[in-house]
Amino acid sequence: MPKYRSATTTHGRNMAGARALWRATGVKDEDFGKPIIAVVNSFTQFVPGHVHLKDLGQLVAREIEAAGGIAKEFNTIAVDDGIAMGHGGMLYSLPSRELIADSVEYMVNAHCADAMVCISNCDKITPGMLMASMRLNIPVIFVSGGPMEAGKTKLSDQIIKLDLVDAMIQGADPKVSDEQSEQIERSACPTCGSCSGMFTANSMNCLTEALGLSQPGNGSLLATHADRKQLFISAGQRIVELTKRYYEQDDESALPRNIATKAAFENAMALDIAMGGSTNTVLHLLAAAQEGEVDFDMTDIDRMSRMVPHLCKVAPSTQKYHMEDVHRAGGVVGILGELNRAGLLHNQSKTVLGLTWEEQLAQYDIMLTDSEEVKRFYRAGPAGIRTTQAFSQDCRWDTLDDDRAQGCIRTKENAFSQDGGLAVLKGNIALDGCIVKTAGVDESILKFTGPAVVFESQEDAVEGILGGKVKAGDVVVIRYEGPKGGPGMQEMLYPTTYLKSMGLGKACALLTDGRFSGGTSGLSIGHASPEAANGGAIGLVKQGDLIAIDIPNRTISLQVSEQEMAERRAEQDALGWKPVSRQREVSFALKAYASMATSADKGAVRDKSKLEG
């Protein structure tokens, strides 16, 4: 029977000082001996996805204490990728994931907490907390802040749906008037919550559901909807149950490594491919798997990308559907239900509800259940009122979207594409692979060959695109922007956005050892591994070299002879693998990150071998 970790600080005469300090936080005599559960919040006023979380930690804490635990809340940092985008601030986004994971470990281990409820939402916060959860392997439940409502505005007598990416594209399009650009900007992000499309934040919150670490609706129920309050309440209640199951009944099935097994990671990846999620999720799943010592790597992702069809198309791949529409169609459970019927789900994997996926689908899949309560839950919809308040409205759709032939979620037979929404490409320019979000690629450019236009920073690429240096048919190459070379592996949303603004969204490709925002679409290929700073072949590309991309056959190649490649490599080895003329100030904190960063195919985690010996 495992001993409560917290007993280290609450029992024994030699812990009198620790108990005195616990008492100063409000712990009473009768509380000693109860499990201490960390409420890991991420409230900040910098981020719309987190601005409404201030009081939600205490909502969870009250439920924990009512159920027989001691709740202690702390906050992590949270970077808003959208605000950090397009300038030096983006260098800090991915490294913040490691800081979040470490800070959770520091707080939980320093105070000997027994379990956690992780209140996350946006891009690097959910992954950082997930990494910490797999590392610590104590009972945990994730509950996110929820997605933002889609924006809406009237243009040319037509109501259109909007999101953050629309504001960015219109703002850079010289053909759009100042008045229309401002109208879209003011309408794009109407409420608190994570940006309304299937961008990185919402993708990751959906994946925690598929991993079994969060409750039904976590990934899709709007931040503003009153129903979301129950997710926080039940998380507080359920974590006490999980904690007691492990520590008092020796039930190891309550631990995250026994829930998020390899089968669960494959379920999460299947979901990601089926819904055309952000390419960033590949980085984060690989990183979390390594923390949990789960044997899951790029080979598994490549294999699954060839099996799983594209069942759910959401912004930025279409403007017809946003997260509120996914929820109306049954949410994550709805997509997993279709994967299960297609034989593509490990349905004996378990979840924090204590159910197998087979059992959970029977209860929560709108295509299977007779429960009016469940159907009402999935009819929760937007109010269209600007607000920063959680649980501020109770609007519902009149009907569910259960049209699996032409609706938001499709059956395998009616899939948007039999080819999944993400793909791994390999070739001489990316020996360890690179990632493309095929859900956002127009069919006309699934095969593409063009001359390289090479840039050694995102800033130069933006200047070149807006300055007319990129023409239809070109392959834009942005290198030395990987985890080590950036450092920090910036998102390339501005270059891809400006290609669209210049009318080149379906006429060009972009290849980088950096990464992309979940808001990216188009023929945008990222995570080229090894990265240029680690001697990757993307560092050998010269202006005008032909690059051939073949998504159906999963290949990408630099059309240069092996002899020429070898000569270029010898030359680059002598010069050193670094940008020729880039001027970029890099702080000590970022240099420390770069000194241990691995390439994207390893999840851009720190190279632990550098700590050995």
From Swiss-Prot:
Documented EC number(s): 4.2.1.9
Record has Iron-sulfur as a keyword: yes
The record's free-text note on cofactor binding: Binds 1 [2Fe-2S] cluster per subunit. This cluster acts as a Lewis acid cofactor.
GO CC term, one of those recorded: cytosol
A Pfam family this chain is assigned to: ILVD_EDD_N
Catalytic activity: (2R)-2,3-dihydroxy-3-methylbutanoate = 3-methyl-2-oxobutanoate + H2O; (2R,3R)-2,3-dihydroxy-3-methylpentanoate = (S)-3-methyl-2-oxopentanoate + H2O
One GO BP: isoleucine biosynthetic process
Pathway: Amino-acid biosynthesis; L-isoleucine biosynthesis; L-isoleucine from 2-oxobutanoate: step 3/4; Amino-acid biosynthesis; L-valine biosynthesis; L-valine from pyruvate: step 3/4
Family as reported in the entry's similarity comment: Belongs to the IlvD/Edd family.
NCBIfam families recorded: ilvD (TIGR00110), PRK12448.1 (NF009103)
Name the record gives this protein: Dihydroxy-acid dehydratase
Organism: Vibrio vulnificus (strain YJ016)
